[in-house]
């Protein structure tokens, strides 16, 4: 019998880093630097498998492809005028919306020993979300939702409407599988914001000669609260996450960064700041 998605979730212990309630001053650049740091320490066997939860207030995270938009400045201005911070992550993919109603989860595994092929990481995250939402008896499907923002083959949807997207980053012997879960508020309003961003940054669809940027239809996206017709909060999802990981492992324990990880984190954060300065031309500090 081949390896199952659940095998990857069944760890002897899970290290938990909960950054879901740090508030509006927690910058998303810190999150991407954090996951790169954890990839390195988990990849070297210095840390067990780690689950990190994170929430960022009113932030648009662009992918590297988005930085090539012909009128990027106009798109960024539109987002900033709506009260959003805009950052560029250190990986591919396209723009996503983060706010206080979106829970992000990163699962960081050691790559080499587990022989994680790309699909297996995605499938493990999909399995985890299905387990988290079991009490709601919803049929969760994983396939690309055309018309959504940052579409991919592991978009998670209920009844054809997307509520989550999964990405993966491999670095220094570690793999970070990342998901955003839209808990509450309006999924279509989030999608409409990204639709207007691309409209401003492209001006004309003919400027997208390679067909890279999605033609967003806001009605393809929804939050879990909308789809399940009940109030689902970030806190509800956090509790479900911890409950499932506890069932799947020998022990859970909370641990911040070690002194060695702190040093690596500072270097990774500097790289993120430099990347963003290169794109947006403004120097910043997160002290």
Curated annotation (Swiss-Prot):
Q: Give the enzyme's EC designation.
A: 2.3.1.204
Q: Which InterPro entries match?
A: aa-tRNA-synth_II/BPL/LPL, BPL_LPL_catalytic, LipL, Octanoyltrans_LipM/LipL
Q: Where is the active site?
A: 150
Please name the CDD domains in this protein's record. LplA (cd16443)
Provide the BPL/LPL catalytic domain boundaries. 45-253
Q: Which GO terms describe its biological process?
A: lipoate biosynthetic process; protein modification process
For this chain, the annotated S-S bridges are none
Q: Name one Pfam family in it.
A: LplA-B_cat
What are the record keywords, sorted?
Answer: Acyltransferase, Transferase
Reaction(s) catalysed by this chain, per the record, are:
N(6)-octanoyl-L-lysyl-[glycine-cleavage complex H protein] + L-lysyl-[lipoyl-carrier protein] = N(6)-octanoyl-L-lysyl-[lipoyl-carrier protein] + L-lysyl-[glycine-cleavage complex H protein]
Recorded superkingdom: Bacteria
Cite the Gene3D superfamilies for this sequence.
Bira Bifunctional Protein, Domain 2
Q: Name the site position(s) for Lowers pKa of active site Cys.
A: 162
Q: Annotated pathway, please?
A: Protein modification; protein lipoylation via endogenous pathway; protein N(6)-(lipoyl)lysine from octanoyl-[acyl-carrier-protein]
Question: Which GO MF terms are attached to this record?
Answer: lipoyl(octanoyl) transferase activity
The miscellaneous remark of the record is: The reaction proceeds via a thioester-linked acyl-enzyme intermediate.
The family this protein is said to belong to: Belongs to the octanoyltransferase LipL family.
Main function: Catalyzes the amidotransfer (transamidation) of the octanoyl moiety from octanoyl-GcvH to the lipoyl domain of the E2 subunit of lipoate-dependent enzymes.
- Protein name per its UniProtKB record: Octanoyl-[GcvH]:protein N-octanoyltransferase
Instruction: Name the source organism.
Output: Bacillus velezensis (strain DSM 23117 / BGSC 10A6 / LMG 26770 / FZB42) (Bacillus amyloliquefaciens subsp. plantarum)
